[in-house]
Amino acid sequence: MVKKNNLKNLGFAFPVGSPHVSRTMMLAELGILLEFVADPQAPQKDYIHAVVQDNCLGKRTAKNRLISKRYLVELYSLDPNLALFRALLFFWQRDQGGHPLLALLCVYARDTLLRASAKYILPLTEGSLVTRESMELFLDN
């Protein structure tokens, strides 16, 4: 069995909470940010600066910029020192049509709630109704 510490070193995360409680995968924001910070060697601080100082996402308030920064870091790490983010950048530049799937794979590795709910969601057909109660019941068991 692979230890959590080894996975964390690659960029996987095991948080108690989840950005998915109040946010989506922020796919559009990720795309804007990765276009704004075009250097694949850029350190994490450059991504954070782009969101918070440069307001590349066009947020109306400083608080919204900080919230967006926090969720983007939780979802994607934005840290080229981690293999997961480096892989995201590598494939992002090579497959524009694959952006949604690449983002999903990265978030799946970093978001506990998404991983926990995948077994419930994946067998459903597109357009199926998922109620809060049914999801809570699944997650509680």
Residue ranges of predicted features:
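Eukaryotic partner-binding/assembly regions in large regulatory complexes
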Residues: V2-A109, V130
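Short helix-capping/hinge SLiMs at alpha-helix to coil transitions
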Residues: P123-G127
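Hydrophobic/aromatic-lined pockets within catalytic cores
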Residues: A38, L122, D140
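A eukaryotic nuclear recognition-module signature that targets compact all-alpha binding cores
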Residues: Y108-I121
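Amphipathic alpha-helical segments within well-ordered protein domains
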Residues: L34, A118-L122, E136
